[in-house]
Design a protein with these regions (language model features):
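Active-site beta-loop-alpha junctions enriched in small/polar residues
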Residues: 6, 114-116
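Short glycine-biased active-site loop of nucleotidyltransferases that positions the nucleotide triphosphate
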Residues: 14-17, 57-62
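Beta-rich nucleic-acid/ligand-interaction surfaces
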Residues: 118-122
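Conserved PLP cofactor-binding pocket of PLP-dependent enzymes
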Residues: 51
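Conserved oxyanion/phosphate-binding beta-strand-loop segments in alpha/beta enzyme cores
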Residues: 1-12
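N-terminal glycine-rich flavin-associated loop
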Residues: 16-48, 66, 70-114, 125, ...
Length: 130
């Protein structure tokens, strides 16, 4: 958890022109960390914004509340069922990394944004990327 000005400043913008200094930044290591962050923020009326790769060009990853950066630790493939052709992942996994792993099994995630080398699945889902 970071509340210093330099750390907050790094999260004050994304790939857009928008800039907002957040109250703080949380970098969770587990889903339980995310749950605890949201519970505490709700208790204090602080808005929460999840952030993946920060590739949004419309400002969806900036706000004046807490930024929850899922891209650092929540990047794993949780389950892969090649027979059913399904994969369950954590929100911080980068699309290109996911597809490198899936390629070994003859699979791929068929969404192709120009930012695939940096865009996370969580961010893509939040923005309805296709």
């Amino acid at each position: 958890v970071w509340f210093d000005r330099v750390s907050r400043g790094m999260y004050a913008t994304d790939a857009s022109i928008y800039q907002m200094m957040p109250l703080g930044v949380v970098v969770p290591r587990t889903g339980a960390d995310v749950e605890a962050t949201i519970a505490i923020a709700r208790e204090h009326g602080v808005p929460v914004t999840a952030r993946g790769g920060g590739t949004s060009q419309c400002g969806q990853t900036v706000n004046h509340g807490l930024i929850v950066d899922v891209s650092r630790y929540l990047r794993d493939v949780v389950a892969l069922d090649t027979a059913a052709r399904t994969v369950r992942v954590q929100p911080g996994i980068v699309l290109d990394e996911l597809n490198r792993g899936l390629k070994k099994h003859g699979l791929f995630f068929p969404v192709d944004p120009s930012t695939a080398s940096r865009a996370t699945i969580g961010g893509m889902t939040a923005n309805n990327s296709s």
